[in-house]
Swiss-Prot record:
It comes from Actinobacillus pleuropneumoniae serotype 5b (strain L20). This is ATP synthase subunit alpha. F-type ATPases have 2 components, CF(1) - the catalytic core - and CF(0) - the membrane proton channel. CF(1) has five subunits: alpha(3), beta(3), gamma(1), delta(1), epsilon(1). CF(0) has three main subunits: a(1), b(2) and c(9-12). The alpha and beta chains form an alternating ring which encloses part of the gamma chain. CF(1) is attached to CF(0) by a central stalk formed by the gamma and epsilon chains, while a peripheral stalk is formed by the delta and b chains. It comes from the Bacteria. Keywords: ATP synthesis, ATP-binding, Cell inner membrane, Cell membrane, CF(1), Hydrogen ion transport, Ion transport, Membrane, Nucleotide-binding, Translocase, Transport.
Amino acid sequence: MQLNSTEISELIKKRIAQFDVVSEAQSTGTIVSVSDGIIRIHGLADVMQGEMIELPGNRYAIALNLERDSVGAVVMGPYADLAEGMSVKCTGRILEVPVGRGLLGRVVNTLGQPIDGKGEIDNDGFSPVEVIAPGVIDRQSVDQPVQTGYKAVDSMVPIGRGQRELIIGDRQTGKTALAIDAIIAQKDSGIKCIYVAIGQKASTIANVVRKLEEHGALANTIVVVASASESAALQYLAPYSGCAMGEYFRDRGEDALIVYDDLSKQAVAYRQISLLLRRPPGREAFPGDVFYLHSRLLERAARVSADYVERFTNGAVKGQTGSLTALPIIETQAGDVSAFVPTNVISITDGQIFLESSLFNSGIRPAVNPGISVSRVGSAAQTKAIKKLSGGIRTALAQYRELAAFAQFASDLDDATRKQLSHGQKVTELLKQKQFAPMPVSEQALVLFAAEFGYLDDVELERIGSFESALLAYANSNHTDFMKNLAKSGDYNDSIKDQLKAIVEDFKKNGAW
């Protein structure tokens, strides 16, 4: 059969008309080496810093090193079956995690996937893990308190909503206990909590989750887990994931509290990644940008203005400020706060609570050292009652420490010095507190009132603990309404002062401790 030229051209035109062109531009590359969770990829000319790269087996890597001939990426998950020659492709997206109220009460991994066996999470959307912190104009000064429930902290190193307060100390000095109690204290305050566990044993994390559940605080908390068995990449990214989940509440005019436990382990994970990527090491073998690692994370904790919230929610929320308060934890070696990472984080944060192993071992718990613990912005956020009644506490402790050191060398002391030493010992005893027993403002105010106005002077040192518990039991049973109102308002005036005085004096007359 012969076709003439007209038929051939018609046939070609028909075929061209029927041809459906579906073109999809893809930037692909080839793995050239795999080692210790780091892959080097040839190709991927259009890849961006921090972009997710799709690997075989529904896994992802994050591009961290963009070099002339190759891309260095860190694998998120298992990498043992990856091999040279495998094909990978760009996604055009940066890492995002699920956010929303559906995460409250759940335990998730760095990627926001549930690991508590309670089924899928009903999230409100996704948010990038790396976000630029709010600017200066979008921020507002810190003037509302976050009550930790610890007398020693709320009176001497108060924390405000939107503040960054570092908890620093050697291992086994009660850093995690302090942070967990601060979360438990928020169960009725309306502050949402996020606990980020980095590089800890799975058994330790399970214990923390159980304690939060026992004390009714888990329903108000998101637990983000990157345990010691996870890859360095997931440990490095966990704080950013938790922060994105906290920002969801901050940007909608609510208050949130996030605990990073602890950033020393995140810095070690980042050092491991950087050295494997062949980045030049600096002091203590950390990379040059380890300061930026923590500063870009902690600057996202802020109190944002009502205008920012209104703009973010497109007018749905008006006249409400939002806040994200951060409690980063840093572990020191033999009390050395001048090491690289501790000094970095101290300079970024708005104050630090320094926990001392010598105090902890001598039975003073929480082991807060009032001499070098400081809150740079929190005093503006203190409740009136605590502010008025805690003024003499720090002074009494400072004088006591000075005199105690001096008294070791002096054989005979005058009455005034003896009185100051005795008062300091009693205040130290009074500030001791058991774990999982946060105190409301009203109870703290009553106890501080008794210390401030000399009602402890005739109480024996070993009876201080029983005096305190009996006084609180008496006040809560006989003056219930007053204690409830004081816990709500945190106010202080002549009327409240007279009422506190009457409670303590009536109780002392009773003498039932």
